[in-house]
Amino acid sequence: MKIVIAGAGEMGSHLAKMLSGNGHDITVIDSDPKLLADVASLADVLTVEGDSTTFAVLRKASVRKCDLFIAVNHVENDNVVAAVLAKQLGAKKSIARIDNNEYLEPNNKEIFINMAIDYLFYPEKVAAQEVINLLGHTSTTEYVDFSSGRLSLVVFRLDPTSSLIGRELSGFKDDAAQLSYRTVAIARGGQTIIARQDEIFMEGDMVYVIARQDAVKEVMEFSGHSNVEINNMMILGGSRIGIRIATELQDEVNIKLIDYNAEKAYRLAELLDKTLIINEDGRHIEAMLEEGLANMDAFIAVTGRSETNILAAMLAKRMGVKKVIAEIENLDYINLAESIGIDTIINKKLVTASNIFRFTMSTDVQAIKCLTGSEAEVLEFIVKPNAPATKAPIKELKLPQDTIIGGVVRGDKVFIAVGNMELSAYDRVVVFAMPASISKIGYFFN
């Protein structure tokens, strides 16, 4: 697939690296030659220097021949203009990053569809929603619903108190004849291990389980964690993510939002009438303690600065806060943050990748989730009539290495996949796979 990316900043360079690694032909546009040099050193891409909102530059990047145009410039208006022009010049699909939730309202969204933009995505909104979902499942590190919640990926770290430590994976399964959950992978020491039945659970393992909705509670009992009711919450950072979280939850939870910028704090106080806004520097330990950090049920660090978020999250964990979530945009810091006990990490690059990746698939992909604690991805496919996957039991399909089918939704029935199961047309199938296998999976469901 030929893909043109407008914007060589952090998000654009991450997408270029990820997509070129999956065998796509990538061209990156940016007006900053240094950013272009940086992205060219990270990935096998072509670069075009110039303004992506001009016809000349878009023509130079051959957008008329591209299958997908992705606008991720820093300026929202530039993304909208570039996406419209690219589609008019011949791009098959055109998508744009936005920073304004107003654009996603149904009436306004229709306008952009009429302008020929295929998809608008707002990473901060998706990241905020992930945080809100996790606050309802505080014992998990990541929690992803598929097929309207009928199947879920449940991720948890094994604490010393977990009864799973020292047991084989084969021993962690539902005893019923029809399984209701199964382990699909373990992340350990920065590596992801696709589930093998003789693998031994170890303390600190990140465990990935596909579960039916009615089995999630049972799965979590094995983790050594328990869900905590969130009544008091502190948000560090009046960023777009922080504002959206407070807006959604301020009627249900007592929220303190801390921001070091006095002018912004005044604006936030007008915007969030049921949230207590505090003008303070979250890096000052004494100030955080005075504001009652130790009494919080949840702490969310979303300042936009990874280092500040990590330090503040470490303090919150030390003070005994039950659920600690930190936004970490530097991908190199993620393993470090997990190793020091931060419960959950959110990353806008991975959120964006999850939104965009499905546009590069030839198969009917309903959802993709790029995981934070693992290089693996989880995908939901719809099986087409006469697809190869319908011709033999799962164990005989010769799926790509490091790929495992976790669950299947068939009409109103939900199954955990086993080797002798045969897939049918229109099944919704949840697949856990490593990046090198992603491009090969679609064949089985087409």
List each model region and its residues.
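Cytosolic regulatory regions of ion transport systems
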Residues: 1-446
